[in-house]
Amino acid sequence: MLVMSNPAAVDGTAALYQKINLRLLPFLLVCYLFAYLDRVNVGFAKLQMQGDLGFSDAAYGVGAGIFFIGYVLFEIPSNLMLPRIGARKTFSRILVLWGITSACMLFVRDVPTFYAMRFLLGVFEAGFAPGMIYYLSCWYGPQRMARAIAIVFLAGPIGGIVGGPLSAGLMTALAGHAGLAGWQWMFLVEGLPCLVLGVLAWKLVPDRPADANWLTADEKRLLEQELAVPAAHRHSFGAVARDPKVYVLAFAYFCVIAAIYALSFWLPTLIKAQGVNDTVQLGWYTALPYVGGAIGMLYMGRRSDRKRERRYHAAVPALAGAALLAGSTLADGNLAATIALLTLGTTTLWMTYTVFWAMPSEYIKGPAAAGGIALINTIGLSGGFWGPAIIGWAKSASGSLHPGVLIIAAMPLAAALIILANRLPARH
């Protein structure tokens, strides 16, 4: 990589990335915000639809998680096609199809249709998150990647901050209008904006830096120099798929994702169990853990880039998250302590999440990065099925949320140990 050593070159690079940041990151953040909101708003819908449709906790847990089965089945094909089809067509297709499917969740009538719609939502959203990581790697070098990921994936915590009060407000304010329940309105209102975003993606997302008409020829050359990867460091997808370290990364990610989505889908229920019965109040309480997550992501992404270190910046928060989640089971009956522990636990998990994705993007280079990142994400995202399902099964079997939460607390502990035990130098 060319190292800019004179002040003028450094200033030029800084100005270039300021332009790229403003052009790409806000739009991608908004897109991912709706992706996150549309996959987890079922956690609020549960508060009404479970009674309306007669779901058990186990059925809800499976339905919440089955989204990830559809996602992982179609993720690698989606991402292998992305470099050939282009980001513009890929993101537009994903946004439009998942928006339609999310809005159509209002037609769920029983457990089989619930499972079917959640599965289809996963199929149509497949490839979006790893596709964005690959897309960002086409614009950002290793020294900037963690911060770029932190900004875009800040959409997860923001989705939690906005989604709790928004979903609760829609369910309360619109209940009974036009003969629809509050949860049906919530799915409709939160799904339709994705159609607009799909159209905008077609117009706003350049497939690659060379296609960006808002960059000058000199800026494109400078960016090409910044991102230059020696031919010896480029990999085929087959070589990546045979690399054991890729699967080590994938299992660590599986553990992190299992914990994040177990909390995302069950957080309203966990807080309601502390005696909060007002839906709007519950919405505000569930936003608090995501405020911590947003702050933690920005802080840890920036710190990790500044220190040029990934392993400890990912593992230490995961260790803390395991302890905090386990500790939350000891605070039963104490609303303030429960929210505090869940907030801190959520914060640490999102810290690990944002730093984690800088590791594979530095380890895997060249055209195989799209498939390699998708492979890690595919294996890891299956944790999104098991995490919520484990809490649902444990709740149905024991009558308590605590056993499931304790099992989930072991997940970030395992992730931390895996990350600490494995060093990932740049892959040659």
Identify the meaning behind each predicted range.
Residues 42-43, 241-298, 353, 357:
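Extracytoplasmic gate region of multi-pass secondary transporters
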Residues 74-86, 296-309:
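Helix-to-loop junctions at the C-terminal end of transmembrane segments
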Residues 83-95, 305-318:
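Cytoplasmic membrane-interface "Motif A"-like loop-to-helix N-cap segments
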Residues 117-154:
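Cytoplasmic helix-loop-helix junction between adjacent transmembrane helices
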Residues 310-359:
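C-terminal transmembrane helical hairpin of 12-TM major facilitator-type secondary transporters
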Residues 73-112:
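Conserved MFS/SLC helix-loop-helix module at the cytosolic interface between two early adjacent transmembrane helices
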Residues 147-171, 193-194, 377-387:
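Glycine-rich segments within core transmembrane alpha-helices of 12-TM secondary carriers
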